[in-house]
Design a protein with these regions (language model features):
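Conserved N-terminal entry element of GNAT/NAT acetyltransferase domains
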Residues: 1-3, 89-120
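Conserved acetyl-CoA-binding loop-helix of GNAT-fold acetyltransferases
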Residues: 56-65, 180-195, 211-219
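Conserved active-site alpha-helix within GNAT-family acetyltransferase domains
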Residues: 80-91, 185, 208-226
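A conserved beta-strand-loop-helix scaffold within acyl/acetyltransferase catalytic domains
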Residues: 42, 137-177
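Conserved catalytic-core motifs of GNAT/GCN5-like acyltransferases
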Residues: 90-105, 205, 221-235
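N-terminal charged segments
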Residues: 1-73, 78-83, 128-133, 139-141
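Glycine-rich acetyl-CoA-binding "A-motif" of GNAT/NAT acetyltransferases
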Residues: 35-36, 156-159, 212
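Conserved hydrophobic beta-strand within the GNAT/NAT acetyltransferase core sheet
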Residues: 169, 202-206
Length: 235
């Protein structure tokens, strides 16, 4: 079923890059795979991901999720299925986003201005203070899993970047006093290079209204999906 799922997902490659990477990395529990409609659960995060070219097969997959009864986070590829998921599963739209992915044959050249390394756990509080989506305990968990990196000038933390549980590049932040120097490029190019050399396709999820970040992705050579996706969560 994995080969079949990849075949169908790759028919709209950029739209489905998070799903196809979950399959490629061995982190996908595939619940259904048909041409134009694939449903999986990403094992590391527990996030369900639903691709449907048309509404009707997507609605059928939402009903399958209703039967499972354990959905806390869900990504869908259609606005009408987003609305149906809110109604049927009791989820709420968290954000709308574009997938971006690095599809080039070699990674971008690193600027080499920062020393990028795993930060000490003593910096977890500082990182949590500058990134609203993780608390201090969650930051420590990311550090221990090797999924969070800091950029340093000497012993000063300039910014940080990491990997979300479902495998996307994110958690990117440059501390206020170091902004407007291009350090975000340095940090993300490091993560792209890291994933590239691990045999992964580097990808990220960017809010549709975050033009600053979308511009950064273009500078890095990332390809952007034409169609947006929708992330829902239980609140």
């Amino acid at each position: 079923m994995h080969t079949q799922a990849l075949k169908y997902l790759n028919e709209e490659r950029m739209l489905n890059i998070a799903m196809s990477e979950a399959v490629r990395r061995g982190n996908a529990e595939i619940l259904s795979a048909e041409r134009g409609a694939v449903l999986l659960r990403e094992k590391n995060s527990g996030v369900y991901m639903l691709y449907a070219r048309d509404y009707a097969p997507g609605e059928a997959l939402l009903n399958l999720l209703l039967e499972r009864g354990d959905v806390r986070e869900l990504s869908v590829t259609r606005a009408d299925l987003c609305r149906k998921a809110e109604e049927l599963l009791g989820l709420r739209l968290d954000f709308e986003y574009y997938h971006v992915a690095y599809l080039e044959n070699r990674p971008p050249e690193p600027a080499g201005r920062l020393e990028i390394r795993t930060p000490s756990e003593e910096l977890a509080g500082v990182i949590a203070d500058h990134y609203e989506h993780l608390n201090e305990e969650q930051v420590i968990a990311h550090i221990r899993r090797g999924h969070l990196f800091g950029g340093f000038l000497g012993d000063k933390l300039v910014g940080f970047i990491g990997e979300h549980p479902e495998g996307s590049i994110g958690i990117l932040e440059v501390l206020p006093e170091f902004r407007r120097h291009g350090y975000a490029y340095d940090l993300e190019s490091f993560m792209i290079d890291r994933h590239f050399n691990q045999g992964k396709i580097p990808f990220a999820q960017i809010f549709t209204d975050n033009e600053k970040s979308l511009s950064l992705q273009r500078k890095l050579g990332m390809t952007q999906a034409e169609q947006s996706c929708f992330w829902l969560a239980r609140r």
